[in-house]
Amino acid sequence: MIYTVPETSTVVFDIRENYPTDEIVIKEIWEEDVYEVKETRLNRGGVVIDIGANIGAFSLYASYYGATVYAIEPEPNNLEALKNNIKLNDKENQIYVCPYAISNYKGTAIISDQGGDSTIVDGDILGSEVEVMPLDNFFALYHIKEVDVLKIDVEGAEPEIILGASKENLQKCKYITMEFDHRTGNRLGEMTQKLSETHHVRTMGSWERGGMVWAWLY
């Protein structure tokens, strides 16, 4: 089903059958602005890294306001939908698709599709093998020098990304925005403590219920 974003009349998404989260994610970003970015943080020509790009809702939002986007999505079903939505909106030259999982180590992992959400799982659970790398390796691979917005939504694996990144590379990120859930666990405090070394940090929610983290560079 083709869904047109009401605010634009031009941005469209191919909503998948049996994936109820697709439309929810689009509305969270385009209507509710849960990541608190709006156009003020999305400068034309700026750089956005979208970790956990899913079907491309945030990536297309950032590209709509002129940013260059690195859309990171390892799960094959989401990856296919991401590429399709980028093509539907003629953004192939503005959004770069990166089929990796970002964590605190380099190697491989099994990732499972859970109705639109995806998460790294134990090897005895069915899923797809994907390449894994730390944020530092990703920055080196794509020669990232400065990031206007780093968005993270990886179903509880946010701490591994932040704790596995160097202070030097976190300082390259002007604004970091992420969603977390109960799977983040009590590592939330450790993660925000590290972020506070380089950024002002604001949180909403708790590790038991989930919530949001927003951080902007000192």
Task: Give residue spans per PLM region.
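Phosphate/nucleotide-binding beta-alpha loop and adjacent structural elements of enzyme active sites
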Residues: 1-218
